């Protein structure tokens, strides 16, 4: 989002299901990285020179591994001067990015607009989001 905004490209982000934690005031500062089934978790994150070898899933189920993976990620973000998620979302919104919450996810989770961090503009349906971004390049990660 930040690179696109810096190049004059409109940025619109639609948060759904697990992404809702990123915009939820109560959860955004306690986000965790689950190592089980996470293809982004590489052994190099633990300081082991193993190339592209992933952390085995069996290790992810061990007690404390989620906390360990989360600490690794937070330490790496701090080392690279990447802002925390709450601050980054505010930077995006301040720079003109449009942030939206998925209505179906909001309804399923019993959330309301006041549950979200500053910068979230509205709760919209997926169809509304597609109408708003018609003709745009959409990236789903």
Go through each PLM region and give its residues.
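Short C-terminal domain-edge/linker segments immediately following a structured domain
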Residues: 14-19, 43-47, 130-136
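Flexible, low-complexity linker and terminal segments
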Residues: 122, 127-141
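A charged, amphipathic interaction segment
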Residues: 59-123, 127
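A structural signal for short, well-ordered beta-strand segments and their strand-loop junctions
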Residues: 12-15, 100-102, 140
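Short coil/turn connectors at secondary-structure junctions
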Residues: 7-11, 94-97, 133-136
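A glycine-rich helix N-cap at a beta->alpha junction
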Residues: 31-68, 73, 81
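Long, hydrophobic N-terminal alpha-helical segment
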Residues: 1-29
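Short, hinge-like loop/turn segments at secondary-structure boundaries
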Residues: 29-33, 118-120
């Amino acid at each position: 989002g930040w690179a696109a905004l810096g190049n004059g490209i409109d940025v619109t982000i639609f948060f759904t299901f697990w992404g809702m934690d990123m915009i939820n005031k109560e959860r955004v500062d306690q986000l965790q990285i689950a190592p089980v089934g996470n293809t982004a978790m590489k052994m190099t994150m633990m300081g082991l020179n193993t190339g592209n070898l992933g952390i085995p899933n069996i290790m992810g189920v061990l007690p404390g591994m989620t906390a360990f993976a989360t600490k690794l990620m937070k330490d790496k973000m701090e080392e690279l001067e990447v802002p925390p998620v709450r601050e980054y979302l505010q930077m995006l919104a301040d720079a003109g990015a449009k942030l939206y919450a998925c209505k179906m996810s909001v309804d399923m989770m019993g959330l309301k607009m006041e549950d979200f961090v500053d910068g979230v503009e509205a709760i919209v349906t997926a169809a509304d989001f597609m109408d708003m971004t018609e003709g745009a390049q959409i990236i789903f990660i």
